[in-house]
Design a protein with these regions (language model features):
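Terminal domain-initiation and capping elements
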Residues: 2-113
């Protein structure tokens, strides 16, 4: 049988030992802008692309149509310049909706130079 030691007799360090490093991200890093580029594929319809650009990226219909056409003819097109988290969120929303409809729509998010 093991001996029970009362807790009040156990020596504990006076201060807890905590080892951590505080990492700060400069504000300019948080505010960096990224370009969202839409890529062409042979499956996703013009209608879906145009609607997604209007609803998710809040682009005017005529501009959305121009982006869809440029994507089709050149293989890719510039959509918007946004902070990284916003760009990722919008791309995720469009790609999720695309997958739900069976479309392989893809985007690229790249740092603005």
């Amino acid at each position: 049988m093991s001996e029970v030691v009362p807790l009040d007799t156990v020596d504990a360090p006076a201060k807890p030992i905590i080892d951590f490093e505080l990492v700060t991200i400069p504000e300019e890093e948080l505010e960096k802008l990224y370009r969202v580029i839409i890529l062409n594929d042979d499956v996703t319809t013009f209608e879906f692309v145009i609607l997604a650009l209007i609803v998710v990226f809040e682009i005017e219909e005529s501009r959305a149509e121009a982006i869809a056409w440029e994507t089709h003819t050149r293989g890719e097109a510039y959509v918007a310049t946004l902070p990284l988290e916003e760009a990722k969120e919008k791309v995720f929303r469009v790609q999720y909706a695309a997958r739900e409809q069976g479309y392989p729509l893809e985007f690229v998010i790249e740092p603005e130079e």
